[in-house]
Structures are given as structure tokens and as C-alpha cells.
């Protein structure tokens, strides 16, 4: 034979996404496309979308993990914007990162000024005597 054709050639390997290669859940291909279309730079390296997707995935996991605590405290199984607000505002670093962000339906942190709290008096002791 002259060696033409595909008689004994290897089968092509199954396609593997860049997200699965990097061990991520966030879409590396989509992040790469958005970086190219966003006119952030003339060229985008191969490692940049992987790194950015990993950072976004980490931040999302961190916020959702912290938001699960207020949800559990309120005996809820679904995280709502209020739980996200409480999680972010009670965490020092996340609050600094998202300080200027307004979360719709998030509400405010419960806070009562010390001046407005009722004063502790000795009336209890006077009544006991």
C-alpha cells in the first residue's frame, strides 16, 4: 500500500474542556471569549482565562459558604439575597472588596446604637429589698 487513507489510524481522543483540564467548574472558554470581546487588551494569553475563572470560582464558593450560615440560622434551605448581604457585611475582607456594592433585597445589618439601649439601673435591687 502507498500509505494513504485511514485504515489503521488511531481514533481521535475524546474532547476535554479547558475547565475540566484545570479542575474548575467555571467555564474557561467563556471567560476567554469575554476577555477577547471586552477590548481589555489586544491579545489574551492562554493562562489568563484559567486564572480568572479560578479566582471567580473561589470568590463565589467563599461567599456561598458564608451565606449558608445565616440561611441555616433562619432554618432555610435556600440562600436569598438577605443571606448574601449578611455574609458579605459580616466578613471584613469581603466587605472591603464589595463595600460600594448594593445588593437588591439585601436589607441592612441589624445595629442598635448603645445610647438608645435601655439603661441598666439599680431598680431591681431596690425592689428586692
From Swiss-Prot:
Quaternary context: The nucleosome is a histone octamer containing two molecules each of H2A, H2B, H3 and H4 assembled in one H3-H4 heterotetramer and two H2A-H2B heterodimers. The octamer wraps approximately 147 bp of DNA.
UniProt cross-link Glycyl lysine isopeptide (Lys-Gly) (interchain with G-Cter in ubiquitin), position: 14, 16, 120
Residues with the N6-lactoyllysine modification: 10
Pfam families: Histone (PF00125), Histone_H2A_C (PF16211)
Stretches with biased composition (Basic residues): 7-19
N6-(2-hydroxyisobutyryl)lysine PTM positions: 6, 10, 37, 75-76, 96, 119
Taxonomy, superkingdom: Eukaryota
SUPFAM superfamilies xrefs: Histone-fold
Native source organism of the sequence: Gallus gallus (Chicken)
Post-translational modification: Monoubiquitination of Lys-120 (H2AK119Ub) gives a specific tag for epigenetic transcriptional repression. Following DNA double-strand breaks (DSBs), it is ubiquitinated through 'Lys-63' linkage of ubiquitin moieties, leading to the recruitment of repair proteins to sites of DNA damage. H2AK119Ub and ionizing radiation-induced 'Lys-63'-linked ubiquitination are distinct events. Phosphorylation on Ser-2 is enhanced during mitosis. Phosphorylation on Ser-2 directly represses transcription.
Entry protein name: Histone H2A-III
Role noted for this protein: Core component of nucleosome. Nucleosomes wrap and compact DNA into chromatin, limiting DNA accessibility to the cellular machineries which require DNA as a template. Histones thereby play a central role in transcription regulation, DNA repair, DNA replication and chromosomal stability. DNA accessibility is regulated via a complex set of post-translational modifications of histones, also called histone code, and nucleosome remodeling.
Keywords attached to this entry: Acetylation, Chromosome, DNA-binding, Hydroxylation, Isopeptide bond, Methylation, Nucleosome core, Nucleus, Phosphoprotein, Ubl conjugation
Family, per entry: Belongs to the histone H2A family.
GO molecular function: DNA binding; protein heterodimerization activity; structural constituent of chromatin
Cellular localization per UniProt: Nucleus; Chromosome
In-chain residues carrying the UniProt-annotated modification N5-methylglutamine: 105
Residues bearing the modification Phosphoserine: 2
Residue numbers of N6-glutaryllysine PTMs: 96, 100, 119-120
Residues with the N6-succinyllysine modification: 10, 96
Gene Ontology biological process: heterochromatin formation
Gene Ontology annotations for the cellular component aspect, listed alphabetically: nucleosome; nucleus
InterPro entries, alphabetized: Histone-fold, Histone_H2A, Histone_H2A/H2B/H3, Histone_H2A_C, Histone_H2A_CS
Amino acid at each position: 500500500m502507498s500509505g494513504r487513507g485511514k485504515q489503521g489510524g488511531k481514533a481521535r481522543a475524546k474532547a476535554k474542556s479547558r475547565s475540566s483540564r484545570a479542575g474548575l467548574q467555571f467555564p474557561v472558554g467563556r471567560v476567554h471569549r469575554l476577555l477577547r470581546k471586552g477590548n481589555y487588551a489586544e491579545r489574551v494569553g492562554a493562562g489568563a482565562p484559567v486564572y480568572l475563572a479560578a479566582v471567580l470560582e473561589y470568590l463565589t464558593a467563599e461567599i456561598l459558604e458564608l451565606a449558608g450560615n445565616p440561611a441555616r440560622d433562619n432554618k432555610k434551605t435556600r440562600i436569598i439575597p438577605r443571606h448574601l448581604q449578611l455574609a458579605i457585611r459580616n466578613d471584613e475582607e469581603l466587605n472591603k472588596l464589595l463595600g460600594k456594592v448594593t445588593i437588591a433585597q439585601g436589607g441592612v445589618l441589624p445595629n442598635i446604637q448603645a445610647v438608645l439601649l435601655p439603661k441598666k439601673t439599680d431598680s431591681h435591687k431596690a425592689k428586692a429589698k
